[in-house]
Amino acid sequence: AGFAGDDAPRAVFPSIVGRPRHTGVMVGMGQKDAYDGDEAQSKRGILTLKYPIEHGIVSNWDDMEKIWHHTFYNELRVAPEEHPVLLTEAPLNPKANREKMTQIMFETFNVPAMYVAIQAVLSLYASGRTTGIVLDSGDGVSHTVPIYEGYALPHAILRLDLAGRDLTDNLMKILTERGYMFTTTAEREIVRDMKEKLAYVALDYEQEIETARSSSSIEKNYELPDGQVITIGAERFGCPEVLFQPSMIGMEAAGIHETTYNSIMKCDVDIRKDLYGNIVLSGGSTMFPGIADRMSKEITALAPSSMKIKVVAPPERKYSVWIGGSILASLSTFQQ
């Protein structure tokens, strides 16, 4: 969250609401019945964490309202009734969802004006393009969204319910098989951090497994909050490999490369060349080192041999949806 015209968000915190697992015994400790975002994160040891957004779509409106309240009053410290608001939504977000979002903004927060933009379109704006295909992969959902001259092509948008949270869960499972205990919502956050710091995408998965077997060159250490040190090797690239091979976690779905290709193939034959040449990665789950090269390699193998493939991975892509929103909302034509 932040202000239009800024080049980076003022506030970045997880969309979680935490509630105490136990009732407080110490009177006057000022315990709250709910914590949001970073505060929920830091007190996670005593809380049960809930995620009001599932697969990119709001599923718990009471908790979502708490998060918005926290955003306006504690993070941005603004009066919502004084500022027009730009919200973003997942592609193919149900209409009822958008209506509920609008209702809460106008009725609960009394905002003067609001607009809801599709996330992937904003990422494309942020990359300085109006035509291309965006692979947007966050925590709960991934989408491939072809965009032509600024318009998303809804018939060709594909959704993949596979994203960051699944990769974290997969890493938890691998570590549990190795004898480490990671089960609670709080411990999931530790594993998420491990994933973000150490995981990478192999250019050639089979070959990387050979390398991991024969040498310790890819091993890295990670220190847990209690001082215990874990060494991870093949898990580093095994964790995000799921994006390309969902069958690894028992999912019957095409990987992100194939989904991108399928999405392009649903578009008019005349615009495919423009899409192949402008494949833009967006979202936190595209931050793995090596992902752009691998994506390029996989799509080159699927596409016609004469086709020029270009995969763009902007360094700020973790926040490119927000940055695109900042650009859009600061245009005078948009404000009218």
UniProtKB/Swiss-Prot annotation:
Annotated compartments: Cytoplasm, Cytoskeleton
Uppermost EC category: hydrolase
Catalytic activity: ATP + H2O = ADP + phosphate + H(+)
InterPro entries recorded: Actin (IPR004000), Actin/actin-like_CS (IPR020902), ATPase_NBD (IPR043129)
Annotated GO biological process: cell division
Record's keyword terms, sorted: ATP-binding, Cytoplasm, Cytoskeleton, Hydrolase, Nucleotide-binding
CDD domains reported in the protein's UniProt record: ASKHA_NBD_actin
Family: Belongs to the actin family.
Miscellaneous comment text of the record: There are at least 5 different actin genes in tomato.
Family matches, as PANTHER family: ACTIN (PTHR11937)
Protein name per Swiss-Prot or TrEMBL: Actin-51
UniProt source species: Solanum lycopersicum
Classification of source organism: Eukaryota, Viridiplantae, Streptophyta, Embryophyta, Tracheophyta
